[in-house]
Amino acid sequence: DLREVFNALRWLVRAGAPWRMLPNDLPPWEAVYQQSRRWLDAGCFEAMVSDLRSIIRVAQGRQGQPSAVVMDGRTLQSSCESGPRAGYDGYKRKRGSKVHMAVDTLGHLLAVHVTPADEQERAQVHKLCEAVQQATGHSVQWAWADQGYTGEAASKAAQGNGIDLQIVKLPEAKKGFVLLPRRWVVERS
């Protein structure tokens, strides 16, 4: 039964357990693994997330697909085992990976790209914009980002995907933490 296979997959994700540790009241781990690979290869989970995102947006009185996104990157500290995959982020003073993400204005995840921490945010604009347009059916027209995305190359990369990149800057007289307009939704994601 596919429902039991799906329940087993949900249990694995929730428990963080290896395949072979599935409880005996669920289907055999081999069957669950094979079916989950089929679902992953067919893009079932991406389609499910896209449909749910559209339903939530319509329920909140918005269009099904977003017209604007917010982009940001965050550095995640790595462990010793990550080896050469980890880079050093001089600004955050951390060794690890950098997660670049794009969310819609409600905070729903649209695209994720992981790089070593020493990669610049502005260099990832093309891949993020490409993934966003693919996920939304080319409905996105605007993107807001922080000052890590400044530069002509980043702007051209976004324009090449039909997106107008707008940088939200920190007010000049302010010091310390300042809540920037349109940027807070990505910080909570």
Predicted features, each with a name:
Residues 1-189:
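Short alpha-helical elements
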